[in-house]
Design a protein with these regions (language model features):
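Glycine- and small/polar-enriched repetitive beta-structure motifs of secreted/surface proteins
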Residues: 1-198
């Protein structure tokens, strides 16, 4: 049933590739989509330049464009409406970016990476369960989270967290592990929480 809903008399789409049960099933005017996997991109109608590889990846995307979803359920709930929101997101990994609905420009790599982001924009999440643990990044923007279960502010922005189970704070650079952290508040005085132990 791939591309089954198309009326080849009236449809104006072109350059689409769909492989899998109901992949790209509803495309009407969307262009240059590559959809591989059962139900991959099956709600796309007008969206274009999307790549979906994996079961239900980009499953509810209707009009979003320029998204890359690789992995089962990656970006599954992106753009459930007919608008052009949820664009230019990249999600690689099982359930990476699962809940992104209208977010733009998120770069998510790893199993469960950024899977609770909904409207957040321009976030970078790299690692297992990043952005999903302590504070559950949802609508915050421009956060950079790297490591194992590193999380950021749910609704705030400009947090950088690197390490093991680190909880990043808005306008702070935090790295280390949960029990032993070093921070720098770059919003105010940019002082480090610990001075150097270098011997002069």
């Amino acid at each position: 049933q791939t591309l089954a809903a198309q009326n080849f008399t009236t449809a104006t789409d072109s350059y689409n590739t769909a492989v899998g049960f109901e992949a790209g099933n509803d495309i009407t005017t969307g262009l240059k989509n590559t959809l591989i996997g059962g139900l991959a991109g099956d709600a796309i109608t007008v969206g274009g330049d999307n790549v979906a590889l994996g079961y239900t990846s980009l499953g509810t995307n209707v009009g979003g464009a320029g998204n890359v979803a690789i992995g089962a359920q990656a970006l599954q709930t992106a753009n459930p409406g007919a608008t052009s929101s949820a664009t230019y997101n990249t999600a690689v990994g099982f359930k990476a970016g699962l809940s992104v609905s209208t977010g733009v420009g998120n770069q998510l790599f790893g199993t469960f990476a950024g899977d609770l982001i909904t409207e957040g924009t321009y976030n970078v999440c790299i690692g297992y369960d990043v952005g999903s643990s302590t504070q559950n990044l949802t609508t915050g923007s421009k956060n950079i989270l790297i490591g194992y279960k590193t999380s950021g502010p749910s609704t705030q922005s400009n947090a950088i967290g690197i390490g093991d189970t680190v909880t990043a704070v808005a306008n702070d650079f935090t790295f280390g592990k949960a029990s032993n952290l070093v921070t720098n508040d770059f919003d105010a005085d940019a002082n480090w929480s610990r001075s150097s132990d270098e011997r002069l």
